[in-house]
Amino acid sequence: MWVTNSEHNVHIQLVNIINNLNLPYAVRNNGWSKITELNVTITNDRPSMRDEVRELCEYLINALVAVLETGKGLAVSVSFGKDSNCCLVLSLEAIKRFKRKYGYMPSCYVINSNTTIENPALDDYFNLMQQNLEVFINTHDLDVTFIEVHPDTTSHWHYVTLGRGKMPRYPGMTRDCSVDLKVKPIKKAKKALAKLTGELVSVVGTRMNESEERKQKMIERGDVANTVLTGEDGDLLILPICDWEVDDVWALLTYCDSSSENALYHSFAPSFDETIDIYRSANSGECALNVGDKGQSAACGARFGCIYCLVSGDKDKSLTAMIESDSERFSYLAGVNKLRDFMYAIRWDMDRRDWLGRSFDIETGFYPLQPVYFSFETRLELLRYMLTLDAQEREWANQFNSGIVRFELVNYQQLIEIDLAWGLYSASPHAFAALLEYHEIHNCGKRYEIGEIVTAPKLPIPAKRWIKLPAAQDISKKDKRHNRDGLSDPKLIEMARNAGIVIPTIKDLFTVHKKNCAVYKI
């Protein structure tokens, strides 16, 4: 607890504000600023908290310096959440000290994976953190490069869920989406960088106390702090804060306020007020500094992840809390939140599933019958809702914000990805159906509103059955696939030819022969 020898009433009140953990961080930090301006001498009669954090950090920084001394660079994976920010603070401090001591440094990287479906409310925050980082790197002349990576097209949520119809990740299902959207792109980038600059050690901010499930998995893998580990694929990694409590995380970020004489480190962000403010908003307005790992509210422990993530259950508590605690700032996300809740509600609605499988037994020619994918009608419905939300946001932007939108759920590239998947799997009744929906909603004024959400009752998934396709479908054993004409429609092609339109040709993916394809114009 901080104390002062001053008998001045204002000084005593300011010290009481600093010591009051129930007050928002911004209020307490403002108290620090005023105390500093007034040149009031204050001391901590229990300095152990700050000293413990410094001792903990120094141990980790020395471990990271030791990695650099082996000639290996650091590759820090960041989401700019509280844990990865801690790892970045520690890594940058280690890099600064190494360069100061030796006059050079191995090439290091800060890597962020843009899934393209993050919470739109965090866009400004991500941009601010990235700008702060790049200014810090240039100011200190560090050989550190910020790299933003993206998942492969076939892993994009729009292609996988709206295009192919693969079910989103619901509670109890594997989280392979996280691997496809974040882990794989980062690992791919690090392998490419290692070939150019030498071996890299990944700095990862996972902590055992985030959840019991996480803790068990980390123990089974043999994860320990401050030791260079070898992953399953041979990737070298170090987990600096794997044994930290959430209090340690918030303490470090709090003590990295460059405006305070009490700052532990002057890092890439002048302060982490923005980080704390975001977590507070997602925690129903309560100060994140007062919430621990055990017994914490769900929002503070929640991930600021994908806007359509359904793993957390029937509600995205983090997003809901942001909207409810600061409606003036985040109410524009209410429609997106409702879309997410709608997707959760239709999980067990078998009438929204596609029953016919997409692969067959080459020996027997039988196709599986089991409802494991969204039907085309459901995918089309979801796309219409998303495009409607985009159109409404654009209307607001044109009227109130100089045409600058706050989010875009479906961009042009994603439309093409959806149409590609619909064409490959013969889902839509005609070519470029997704582009047509975009045109009708954005240019012709059509709107599709999400109605009352009714949660379908849980049902067992019917057992897999098999069906033999009619002989007329002509299954080719040579090509091991069902013949499809794709974009080739003889009637449309002939009509276009009679109208004097030049007919384009494409090379068939399977026969390698050229063929005419239908002309489509919006």
What spans do the regions from the language model cover?
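Nucleotide-activated chemistry modules centered on ATP-dependent adenylation/adenylyltransferase
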Residues: W2-A75, S84-I522
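Catalytic cores of secreted/periplasmic lytic hydrolases that degrade extracellular macromolecules
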Residues: G81
